[in-house]
Amino acid sequence: METLGSLKNVTAAEIYNTVSGTPWNGGRADSSNILDVASANGVFFQYVAADDCHFYNGDACRSYIMVQAEELSQKAILEAIQAGRFYASQGPRIHQITVENDTVTVECSPVSCAVFNSHLVWSDDRCKTGDGMTKIVYPRSDYGDGERFVRVHLTDAQGNQAWSNIIHF
């Protein structure tokens, strides 16, 4: 944690990298656990998913970011990334995330699982499951001192995932 906390001027951290997963590299593709611990300790990053292709069979073009830029130009894309207007994905689309009255609403492409991760070790109704969910509503937990933030993790029926950036309350 000391090392992560000492990092400055970091645009984003890689939450998922396909080539680090099995069968190529021993199942270390997902770094969400360590990033969640960092967030719980007040060290916040924006999240990207990426594939630095090594030309293994099946490692290319599986993880990426979706950017909400004003136009399709390098300048606009970089501005959107710096402003945090992006999310990491392997397929599921996050159309909109809104926070109103301590309730998070996610509108997305059809998913079968939505998890609202936070600094709390437990939160009632954190995991939502169902077939083809396109709107998921999550009330902020008041367990303990209440949630300070959440991160949305979506999984579709094919096992593809999407990760939002941190949503602060």
Give the residues covered by each predicted segment.
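Charged catalytic cores and adjacent phosphate/nucleic-acid-binding surfaces used
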Residues: E2-F169
